[in-house]
Each structure stands twice: as structure tokens, then as C-alpha cells.
Design a protein with these regions (language model features):
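Hinge/lid segment of periplasmic solute-binding proteins
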Residues: 104-153, 163-174, 180-182, 226, ...
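Extracytoplasmic/periplasmic substrate-recognition and gating elements
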Residues: 63-68, 72, 140, 279-340
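Conserved N-terminal structural module of periplasmic/extracytoplasmic solute-binding proteins
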Residues: 2-13, 17, 21-107, 272, ...
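Glycine-centered hinge/linker elements that transmit conformational signals in sensory
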Residues: 175, 217-247
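A structural signal for short loop-to-beta-strand junctions that line the ligand-binding cleft
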Residues: 90, 97-98, 125-159, 184-188, ...
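Periplasmic solute-binding protein
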Residues: 108-115, 131-172, 190-215, 303-310, ...
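Extracytoplasmic "Venus flytrap"/periplasmic binding protein-like
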Residues: 64-130, 137, 143, 158-162, ...
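Long, aromatic- and glycine/proline-rich binding clefts that accommodate carbohydrate-like moieties
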Residues: 135-136, 288, 337-386, 393, ...
Length: 421
């Protein structure tokens, strides 16, 4: 396996909402799409796997596409988390789709396994944000059309907090001020690396070193001086009793949500996927970008991008790409946002009133400028568990930050080496 893979760089990132959602695309793709597919190779139909309960807009675009081009588009609902494994079985058997939907951080693994085809023309991605474009790059090639983005933001109860704090020092003071009343000023799942990454990166840590747009999995920065400082900062919130003891492990998310919906927590760090549950529970919800760290740096959250990718087994790539250019253009991306609150990484929509008037969507767009696409190279799979274990040791006070970070990196390096043999 190559030691350097093309991947999303640090780039202004994310516009998050509901754990994954949105859609992106071009504003005017007619001239491009007309050249991409010819009538000589027109198929009877193409098949796209869409996420469950989020296919109505796709079906509407498919109907219009068939009317205009004479190519039927069959839209099949398949749970997004199941599509990767299902393609591995159905694709080689000739029963798979032309297009699948996957989280961008799975692109490297699926492409390495031979199940994805790169785009024939990367220039069609120019209408997407830089962060979204970088997220779908792997090994020097583009592997999909960004549909939607997500990243954690600061959510607050407007009945308890009139205005979102701008700094973590403000949140630290608030947390201490309300502690005696059994309240929590701020809660976050910082024993989970997905959320903790923002702090660690903000202090100077990094997962894999970026080199000319490529990530080098042989250079891991999760135990450098900045990363250890991030570990120590995270541990401080637990050790000073500003986070409850139950905010560790698998039940941490449930505990945090309960405290927030019961008005015992003033603010939380969470993503768009949490919005429906909070509002249904009656929370007067506000949202803002994450506050800056004590060092003055932003919290550099992870960004995720739902991506429409092409099956390596398709015989209709030209027409599949033509459909995706239509599905992810500005008009249809906005329609998906209005239907499903999925935030589209389309540059032209950043100032669209429909999106800017939505407080959570705007917070995600703003946070995006400091977000980092999750590495999509296969080696990232070896990072999550060792980092979770290290963070939990720090959170529970069982081990200091330096040793926890060193041990985690050692395990990650060993696992990557073992998988590359």
C-alpha cells in the first residue's frame, strides 16, 4: 500500500448539520454535461442508491432527467452505512448500482479495494467549496460529488444563555459559576476522538502530516507538544468536575443529551444530527461556531462529507456523471437542504438567504472555515480506537497526557505497519 495517499487537506471546512447531510454541486452544468454523455452510448437506465427516507428530491430530479435525456434513473433506498459492503457483493456479481452514497472518509478504503471509479473530469467540482473538493480526493484523483457536509458546532439553550460565548475561557468561567447549583456550563464528548480532535488540532496536533496535498501516514502528530497540550486541556474539564463522571464511554452521548434537554447544561458541542432531538424536546436552540481556545486558536473540528461515488462496475459512467452533475447543482442542492436540512457544500449557496437564516446551517458554514476533512486514507481506520482509549485514560485520571498520547501513537504505528505487510 502506498505510504502517501491524496486526501483532503486542511481547508475551510464544513457546514454541518444533522449528522451528515446536505448536498452540493454546480450552478450551471449544461455545457459540461452535454459534452460528457453522447447519444451513441445511451443506456436504458442507470441506478443510484440513495439514503433511506431521503430519496424524494432525488426521484424528482431523476424524473426530470429522464424527460430531458431519455434515460431512466432508478432510485433505490439503501442505508448509507450498508452501501459499501453491499457494493462489494453486488458489484462483482453484476447486480450493483452505477452510483452509491458514502461518507468521504471511506473513499480511500473502497477505492483501494477496487470498487470505485474516479471521475472522468475533476473540473466539474469547481462549484463546490475547497474543503468539500479536497475531501473527495484520493491518490491524486477525484472520487465523487459532494452531497452534504457536517461538523460539530456550539449549541446552546437560549433560555439559559442569551448569547453564544466566543471563547472557551468564557465557557470555563460559566461552568465554574453554575457548578455549585448542579448545572453545567458546557459539555462535550471529549473522550471520543471525533469531537476531541478539534481541541488537539487547535493546540497543534495532527493525525497525519500533510505534504503537498497528500497525507503521510508514517508521520503522526498525535503525541507532539501541541497534541499533549490538547490532551491536558481536555483532562482539565473532567478532573475539575466541570464534566460529569457519566460523560465517558458509550453512554456519554445519552447522558449529555439528557442534561441538555433537561436544562441542566447550558451549552454542548454537537452536530446537526442532534438538532431534531433537541428541538423536539422543547429546547430553545441556538447555534454558533465553536469558541476559540485559550491559545487564541480555533477549535479545528473534523468535517464529514456525504459523497455520491461511481461504482467501478458501472458500464454507464458518462451518463451517471451527467446525472450527478444535475443532482448536485445549485438548484437541487438547495432543494435537498429545504427537504432534509442537509447542508450543501456549494460555494454559491454560502450567502443564500434560505441557508443563512437557518441558525444551525450558518453555524456550520462558519465553523467550516476552521474544520478539517477527516482523513480518507485507509490508515485512518487504525486511529480511532487507540485514541479513544488514550482519551478515556486522561478523562478518568488514570494516566497522564504524555504517556497516553505516546501509547496511542505507538499502537497506531504498529497497526498500520501490520496492515501494510
Amino acid at each position: 500500500m502506498k505510504m502517501k495517499k491524496m486526501v483532503a487537506g486542511l481547508s475551510t471546512a464544513v457546514f454541518a448539520f444533522s449528522a451528515l447531510a446536505a448536498c452540493g454541486g454546480g450552478t450551471d452544468n449544461e455545457s459540461t454535461t452535454d459534452n460528457n454523455a453522447s447519444s451513441d452510448n445511451k443506456p436504458e437506465k442507470i441506478v443510484i442508491w440513495e439514503d433511506i427516507e431521503k430519496s424524494e428530491t432525488t426521484k424528482e430530479v431523476a424524473k426530470k432527467f429522464e424527460e430531458e435525456n431519455g434515460v431512466k434513473v432508478e432510485v433505490v433506498e439503501v442505508q448509507m452505512t450498508d452501501q459499501k459492503d453491499k457494493l462489494a457483493l453486488d458489484g462483482p456479481a453484476g447486480k450493483g448500482p452505477d452510483i452509491i452514497l458514502v461518507p468521504h472518509d471511506q473513499i480511500g478504503t473502497i477505492a483501494d479495494q477496487g470498487h470505485l471509479a474516479p471521475l472522468s473530469d475533476e473540473s466539474v467540482l469547481d462549484t463546490f467549496t475547497d474543503a468539500a473538493k479536497s475531501a473527495v480526493m484520493f491518490d491524486g484523483q477525484a472520487y465523487g460529488y459532494p452531497k452534504s457536509v457536517e461538523t460539530p458546532v456550539l449549541m446552546f439553550n437560549k433560555d439559559l444563555v442569551s448569547e453564544a460565548p466566543k471563547t472557551m475561557d468564557e465557557l470555563y468561567k460559566l461552568s465554574n459559576d453554575v457548578k455549585a447549583d448542579g448545572q453545567y456550563g458546557f459539555l462535550a464528548l471529549w473522550d471520543n476522538f471525533y469531537f476531541a480532535h478539534g481541541v488537539i488540532a487547535g493546540f497543534g496536533g495532527y493525525v497525519f502530516k500533510e505534504d503537498g496535498g497528500a497525507l503521510d501516514p508514517s508521520d503522526i502528530g498525535l503525541n507532539n507538544e501541541g497534541a499533549v497540550e490538547g490532551f491536558e486541556y481536555i483532562g482539565k474539564w473532567y478532573q475539575e468536575g466541570l464534566f460529569p463522571k457519566g460523560l465517558v464511554g458509550e453512554s456519554g452521548g445519552q447522558a449529555m443529551d439528557q442534561l441538555f434537554t433537561e436544562k441542566k447544561a447550558h451549552t454542548v458541542m454537537n452536530g446537526p444530527w442532534a438538532v431534531a432531538g433537541y428541538t423536539d424536546a422543547g429546547v430553545n436552540l441556538g447555534a454558533a461556531p465553536m469558541p476559540t481556545l485559550p491559545n487564541g486558536e480555533p477549535i479545528k473540528t473534523f468535517m464529514g462529507v456525504k459523497t455520491y461515488a461511481l461504482s467501478a462496475y458501472t458500464e454507464n459512467q458518462e451518463w451517471a456523471e451527467k446525472f450527478l452533475q444535475e443532482l448536485t447543482n445549485e438548484e437541487n442542492a438547495l432543494a435537498m437542504f429545504e427537504a432534509y436540512n442537509e447542508i450543501p457544500p456549494v460555494s454559491a449557496l454560502e450567502s443564500n438567504e434560505t441557508i443563512t437564516s437557518n441558525e444551525v446551517a450558518k453555524a456550520v458554514f462558519d465553523q467550516a472555515t476552521n474544520a478539517i476533512p477527516m482523513p480518507n486514507i485507509p490508515e485512518m481506520g487504525q486511529v480511532w480506537e487507540p485514541m479513544a482509549q488514550a482519551l478515556q485514560l486522561v478523562a478518568t485520571g488514570k494516566q497522564d497526557a504524555q504517556k497516553s498520547a505516546d501509547d496511542a501513537v505507538k499502537v497506531i504505528e504498529q497497526q498500520i505497519q501490520a496492515n501494510n505487510q
